[in-house]
Structures are given as structure tokens and as C-alpha cells.
Amino acid sequence: MTSIPTNFNSPLSNDLNPITQGTALPYDILNEQFQNAAYPETKLQIRGGGFGSDAAAHPTNPNQFYALTDRGPNSDFKGSLGEGKQFLVPDYSPKIGLFEVKADGQIRKIKEIVLKDRNGQPVSGLPNPKALGGTNEIPYDISGNPMTIDPSKPYDPQTNPVKTDLNGLDPEGLAALEDGSFWISDEYGPHLVHYDAQGIEIERINPFTQDSRNNVIIEGRPLLLPAEFAKRRTNRGMESLTITPDQNTLVGVMESSIDNPDKSGRLSTLTRMVMINLKNGVIKQYLCRLDAKEHVNSAIAALSEHEFYVAEHDRQFPLQQSTAKKLIYKFDISQATDINNLQALSDNSNDERIHCDSELGLLINRQTLEQWIAQDECHWDTLVELGIHPVQKTLAVDILQAIDYPHDKLEGIWLRQDGSIGLLNDDDFAMNDSDKGVEHKYLDAKKTIIDGNRLYVVYPKV
């Protein structure tokens, strides 16, 4: 066990209420007008719910935690403009929920904080413009029509184009700060957005030099994410976010390999961690190695300035796939190589295989790191030979060996003051895509158990 495996923000006390495994979070009904494709005689109950994108400890109350929604209920859809997403609750705004574990183990929702732009207007979950994080994902409305600037008129690429939202967000990572504000990472930009306690945007950091909203200024220059982060895959952005105990450094992890320079990197087991010091502006970047290319990193919680708990899973339902994996690793960056300092890497290496590119980052044999690793898994060993060391990871919890966890996703980890870890699944608003259409999200192959947001607890061994 690490020396301080605690919620670093919470004073030690004896008031920590126990978690009953699998306790349900409360939800309401957002929509009940669509047919449930699995059982056409029934209605699809879209639940809100959806507080499973991430979790974070309340800064002072050891029994409270924050949980995050994503962009809202949506499904894969192919319409008149091609493949995209159908937004089944089009006016949905992403939000943060504050929850409390009561003495009897039940969970109470205390409040919701709707995310808003700098003018105090609720943001949507619609995609961003192409230049600022969009991937040309087409949004469709509940009738299957393209969502346009003027919904009263038909689509026209010149006079009435597809609607995007400059401030639209697909939230995935959450850091709750001691001052009551929040940093959120998303899957569009990726963007890192700082919200005040009321959910109004204060600051923003992303990879786009032309975005005037990047207003975290250090020594006269805006802080920007490394340029290669703009090559994130659709729906595979900055899935995880935390802040170090000193409240100085944001730490984010990408869900999967990025499209760097293109889709050829998707077969890689490489993901990237970024550390952003909000005080001095220093940005560091480290390489993380997944157990398998099909796995994803999905949550992070800081233990110290160099150690973190990070979730890794395979998106499989344990009740349907006996080989499913749900894991918590401890990451240690103390011996890892900062690959963001490209000039230093180049200057300190006499190896002609190492090159640097301002848009693609570190290159090996003129290939991006994603391409290099996708080409041969043994290339991880070559990186070490070149003096480029990935993050060290040690298994802390094999969740499926420790508890009954029937969910496909593991996206929220809540570090508690006794060293335990609260686990929160993403229920996708209790809905899922299927060959027949949109249906409830079922945990079992017979489609009898509907998924829902539930809280679990595990005890790490390191």
C-alpha cells in the first residue's frame, strides 16, 4: 500500500460511510417515446442517469463525490448525409452531479451543475466545428434529419449547413478542485475546460493555436496541448483527468491511440499522458502501454505528483464474455521519459532514428510513435534501448477477481480517504445500439438485465 492512499483533499475522520456493492444511483426519465428494439411492444426508457463518464472526490466531505455525464443520449445513425449520430434528446446539456453515500449505504443526488459557456448559457453536446476539434461527425435529430443552423429549413451546404457548436462538449474526465471549481476533459478537441462552482466556463486549454478561448496565459503565451493531441480518434479523446494533490498540475490520459498521422496507428497499444503545470506552464508528456490494443484507459486519480491509479478495460460485458478485463493499475512516472521536450530528446541522442516534428511529435525512423508500435509490439523494447521509457505500471486491482462487476465500462474512480477506490460504470443513459435499432443497454446476452449507474468499492494491493 502506498504511504498515503487517501483522498488527499479530505481530512481524516471516522465518518466514512460504507459502500454497499452495486448500489444504484438515482435517475429520472428523460424520454420514453421511442420503441425498444429488443422488445418492440415496449418503450425505450432513456434515463438520466448517465453519470458515469468520470467521478471525483468532494474536496472536504468524505462521503460525497462528483460524477459526470457525457454529451447526452445518442445512437449510431446513417442518414441522408452519411453516418453520424442521432441525438435522441437534442436539447440535452452535459452536467456534473453531486452525490452522497448515506449511513445506510443508499446514494442521494444532492444537486446537478449544468455546464455553461462564458455567457452563462448551457452548452450542448453537439460536435465542434472541424477547425476546433470536430471530425465531421453528422448530427441527426429525433426524426432522422440532419440538424441544421435553421431547423425550419431543409439542409443546404451553403445557406443552411449542418449545425455545430463551438462550445459543444463531450465530457469524459473530471477533476474537482479545493476552491469548488472543476476541470473537465472531453472527446471533441480534446478540450480541457475550467468551470466555476456554478458550471460557467472560466478557462480553456486545447491544441488549437487559432482558438482565442485558450486563455491560460503563462509568461505572455497561452498554454496549449501538444499539437499531436488534435489527432484524437472520433469518440476516443481525453477520457481521463485528475489534478495532483498540490492542486498545481492537471494530468490527462488519452483513451486509445490517436490517429497520428492517420488511422494506421489504431493498431497500437500506445496511449499518451499529458501533465500541465498551471503555475509555471511546463507541459510534460509520457507514453503509456495498454495490455492489448483493444483495451482503453478510462479513468485516473492522483496519489501524488508522480503516482496515479488508472483504469484499463476492454469494453466487454462480463456476463457475456468470460475473458472480459477490468483493471486498476498504479502508474509511476518517476522513471518515465518526458517526450514533450523534443529538442532535448534530439540533442541528447546520437541515434539517427530519432527525429522530431512540430505537428506529429517524436518520430522513430520517420514514423510516428503510434505507427512504430503498431508495426511491431517489440518496438517498445527498441524505445527503451533509445532511452525512451514508458510509464511504469503495476496491477493494483483485478476487478473481476475482486468483486461481481457486470458492466462493460469502467469510467469513474473515486479515491476515498481510507485508501479504497469507489468504482462507477457508464450506463450510457440505459440505451445501446443494436442491429435492430436502439434498445435498452442490457448486461446479459438474454437481454433481461438493464444497465444502470452503480457504485462499487475495491481495495488496491499497491
For each predicted feature, which ranges?
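Sequence/structural signature of beta-propeller domains
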Residues: 5-462
